[in-house]
Amino acid sequence: MEPLSPYPLKCSSPKAKVFLVFFSMVLCTGILCVLQLKFLRAKGGDFYSYEVTDAKGRTVALSKYRGKASLVVNVASGCPHTEANYRSLQELHREFGPSHFTVLAFPCNQFGESEPGTNKEIEAMAKRNYGVTFPVFSKIKILGSEAEPAYRFLVDSTKKEPRWNFWKYLVDPQGQVVKYWRPDETAESIRPEVASLVRQIIMKKKEDL
């Protein structure tokens, strides 16, 4: 009797070959999916990697704000919180901006339909009534499947979805969210965090000289 071979015999049946081909295809597809996910995560890894649209319909790369601290806010013109928030936002922008800090305002009509106007009307109202000097972008959606990708990044980062107008996210110079505030929280509660980030930015610039 011949001794058994220490190596497994090659399987040459048609079914085995089909299985091997199918398994190879599944494996390759899986690897491609993983690589694609890694690429997408790298591309959208911070707030400043996105593009948005301004009130005049022009594309704006948020990368222009990289290196600054940004307070991102969903604004509305006809909300009980409108006046107090617009005034406090402009106050913060005047105090800490524009070199190291900026407010980024995104009108949204998803809360109480309190922002029904056109982009032109919204921007004009903000400048006329509250003297805003910070950017007011085009009206967006921040909830649901049609949410603006840049805003979805803020929500995903904090696991906190805005429940009303004037929800605020503080973004650091690298595009990561460091804190958020609800509409009823005053500028006084926001100021220390903004001041701290701005100090860090100034100190880093001095060190890099």
UniProtKB/Swiss-Prot annotation:
It is a single-pass membrane protein. InterPro entries: Glut_perox_Gpx7, Glutathione_peroxidase, GPX_CS, Thioredoxin-like_sf, Thioredoxin_domain. The chain crosses the membrane at residues 18-40. The active site is at C79. One of its GO terms (cellular component) is membrane. It is found in: Membrane. Keywords: Membrane, Oxidoreductase, Peroxidase, Transmembrane, Transmembrane helix. It is an enzyme of class 1 (oxidoreductase). PANTHER family: GLUTATHIONE PEROXIDASE, GLUTATHIONE PEROXIDASE 8-RELATED. NCBIfam families: gpx7 (TIGR02540). Belongs to the glutathione peroxidase family. This is Probable glutathione peroxidase 8-B. It comes from Xenopus laevis (African clawed frog).
